[in-house]
Each structure stands twice: as C-alpha cells, then as structure tokens.
A protein has these predicted regions:
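Conserved nucleotide-state-sensing and coupling region of NTP-binding domains
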Residues: 8-77
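Short, well-ordered alpha-helical packing segments
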Residues: 6-9, 16-23, 111, 115, ...
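A structural signal for short, well-ordered beta-strand segments and their strand-loop junctions
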Residues: 6-9, 69-70, 86, 125-128, ...
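Conserved RecA-like ASCE ATPase "motif II neighborhood" in helicase/translocase motors
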Residues: 50-113
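Short, well-ordered alpha-helical segments in soluble proteins
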Residues: 26-30, 94, 118
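Non-catalytic, compositionally simple segments
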Residues: 95-213
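An acidic- and aromatic-residue-enriched active-site/binding cleft used to recognize and process polar
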Residues: 10-13, 73, 90, 129-132, ...
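Walker A/P-loop NTP-binding motif
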Residues: 1
Length: 213
C-alpha cells in the first residue's frame, strides 16, 4: 500500500481503463479477504485537497502513501516519484511500431520522462508485442542492459538499477523448452483463446507479422 506505481500505455484512454480495472479489483471481496486494511476513498476526489485522490486515472490508498497513476504514452509524470513503472502496449499496432517517428518519440519519452522519475530501488516492467526490432525493448538491448532468462532462479538474481531481464513467450513454441516455458515444440501459448489452427491460419496470411507474435 505504500508503493507508488505508474502505468502507461499507447494512449490515455487505455491506461485509464487499466487504472479502473485495478480499482475494481481492490474493492472486490476476494482482495478484501487478503488485504482488509487496503482501502480507497469512497468518493471520486479530483484533487488532493481535503481527501485522498481518486478518479479515473489516479488513486491514493487511504492512510498510506502509495497509489497508482496512469498516463498515456508521452504523458507527464512530473512531481511523481515512481517505485514501480509498468508499460503495457506502448505501440498501438504494427503501423505505429514501424513508424520511425513514433519509435523515436517513445524513446525520448522514456529517457526524459520515465527515467527521470525512477530511483535506485525502482522496478520496471515492459510488456508488448515485438512489432519492430528497434522498439523500446530493442533499444535497451542495444545498450547491453538486457539479458534473457529461462529459469525461475534467474528471476531473483540481483540486478543493477539499469539492468533488465527478458522473458519471451512465443505464440507457437519453436525454441527449446525451459523451466519458465516448458511447452513442447509446436504448442500454442494460450490454446483456449488462440488455438494452434487459428495461429497457423494467421501465419499463412503474413509470416513476417506472425513472427512478431
């Protein structure tokens, strides 16, 4: 409850939706059973004056110092210390990720806005489809700060504040099985939602784009 979290996505609307989803989880009965003392303001407070902040894009935990703020890609984080930075789908689609202008704007935003709000103990998570090799993850890899891992023990190895670990989950398993991804060769990642047959059909349409998955 004392952790200051920021979540970002390709636009403000989607980032705000993630924020509202979190609020619903925090107020749900299952969460309350585990964390009964973690509560949010009952009223939608637009500002911090006289109340704990709570609206569609930011909330504060009552009687604690933590909270969650959502921003669209390129949005401001000025004045906000960030303990945990979550970046989900910074590129809307294939076209955006293949735009040099968009890719450069994402890099500029990350290096000038996001990085400036982090501290020595901050943690970061980036999740998105790798539509282009020079996306944000690719640029970080070029800096030599990213190492791919395959075992659970590797997750808990100490990292420097500017180092990353990378976990890659293929839509259809093609690489060697690992502890983190023990699927057999040719096995789909989420068969109940995306069957192997539907994935192969997608691959037939455009192999290059499918390989991004």
């Amino acid at each position: 409850p004392d952790t200051k979290i920021a979540v970002a996505s390709y636009n403000f609307y989607f980032a705000s939706k993630l924020n509202r989803d979190v609020q619903r989880i925090l107020e749900g009965p299952n969460y309350k059973k585990i964390f009964p003392d973690t509560t949010l303001s009952r009223n939608n407070a637009v500002t911090r004056l006289g109340s704990y902040l709570r609206n569609g894009n930011e909330f504060e935990v009552v009687n604690q110092i933590g909270g969650l703020k959502s921003v669209g890609r390129g949005g401001a984080l000025t004045g906000n210390k960030v303990d945990v930075m979550l970046m989900d789908d910074l590129y809307k689609d294939y076209m955006e990720a293949n735009s040099p202008v968009v890719r450069e704007s994402v890099w500029d935003w990350y290096t000038t806005v996001v990085d400036s709000r982090l501290h020595n103990e901050s943690q970061q998570l980036i999740v998105f489809t790798r539509w282009h090799e020079e996306d944000l993850i690719g640029r970080l890899e070029q800096k030599g700060k990213v190492k791919e891992i395959h075992n659970f023990d590797d997750i808990y190895q100490p990292l420097k504040h500017d180092e990353w670990i990378k976990i890659n989950f293929e839509a259809i398993k093609q690489s060697e099985a690992t502890e983190l991804d023990p699927r057999a060769d040719g096995e789909p990642l989420w068969p109940n939602r995306h069957s192997k047959e539907s994935l192969l059909s997608t691959m037939e349409l455009d192999v290059e784009k499918f390989n991004c998955l």
